[in-house]
Amino acid sequence: EIMPVAATLIDVDADGDGGVVAWMDGTVMKVSTQTPGKQVIAATSCQEMFMIKSNLISIDFSNLDTSNVINMSHMFEGCTRMTALDLTHLDTQNVTNMSHMFLACIGLTNLDLTPLDTSNVTNMDSMFGYCNGLTNLDLTTLDTQNVTRMGSMFSGCSGLTNLDLTHLDASKVTDMSY
């Protein structure tokens, strides 16, 4: 998408040449290569990418290639106004760290984890901590066979009334502390 003329530009690419830019469109942060048909390729770390962007209501990942990402820790932490997050286009096949990924996303009332490939994830510490708006969290599609850290994974999730842990493989977990 081409950035509107009146928008305030934020240069977000690695070399600072303006090849990838971001701007706010109301409550939506948009990121673009400014080249039609070309995706933004994320670095290996998306740590804190949207952290404490409290005005964000939605994020469209259809133009972001995350296939090389290994660290998504704190990625959405503190995005308090988001009520739902569409993870359909988020490629997580190489991610090893999802700690604090949704921490303090207090507005989330719906979170479909089905699109996430968590087969390589080892750290899920505080992944859903303080997601007070979630009443139901379906973990049946999460592959946790390689996870070693699950400390405080659901800490402070005071709204959770339905949480089925029967499919959670904790055989390699060494830290489940609170």
Model segments located where?
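Negatively charged
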Residues: 1-178
